[in-house]
């Protein structure tokens, strides 16, 4: 889609890191709250995007991500949404797959990683071993994962 102006993240400091500025050759000075400095020629390659995302991984955390994402209701839950607990430490689990039956009942698969963006892991459901790596929130207010619990009110979307 090439909607580069929609790719932006807020650092924990509050600074808005815009990918559209990055591809114009601006880089981010993280001193204070942050500022843009023209340091490179305009470019939009995979290497540029990866460099931008490395900066995002370094200076964004669960506190800023929780504020940036919008609340999502369980009935509208979709792949790419996340349960997020902002803090230090905080944590995020990402919905990476989902299935829905004729009654509208959903099961979903979760993935997690740790900082700084380490290898991704698929989570086993500790509450219902029969579901394996699948989760269901039917009749529940709390999502229980192997290491973290999340309220259903902590579901967020971009």
Regions picked out by a protein language model, each given a short descriptive name:
Residues 1-78, 82-92, 96-97, 103-115:
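Acidic/His-rich structured neighborhood in mature extracellular/periplasmic domains
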Residues 107-158:
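Low-complexity, Gly/Ser/Thr/Pro-rich intrinsically disordered linker/tail segments
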């Amino acid at each position: 889609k090439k909607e580069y102006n929609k790719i932006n993240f807020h650092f924990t400091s509050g600074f808005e890191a815009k990918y559209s500025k990055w591809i114009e050759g601006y880089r981010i000075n993280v001193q204070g709250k942050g500022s843009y400095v023209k340091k490179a020629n305009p470019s939009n390659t995979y290497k540029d995007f990866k460099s931008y995302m490395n900066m995002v991984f370094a200076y964004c955390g669960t506190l800023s991500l929780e504020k940036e994402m919008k609340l999502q209701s369980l009935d509208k839950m979709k792949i790419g949404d996340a349960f997020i607990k902002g803090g230090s430490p905080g944590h995020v689990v990402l919905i990476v797959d989902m299935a829905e039956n004729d009654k509208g009942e959903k099961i979903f698969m979760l993935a997690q990683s740790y900082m700084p963006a380490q290898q991704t892991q698929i989570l086993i459901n500790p509450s219902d071993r029969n579901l394996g790596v699948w989760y269901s929130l039917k009749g529940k207010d709390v999502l229980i994962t192997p290491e973290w619990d999340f309220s259903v009110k902590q579901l967020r979307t971009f």
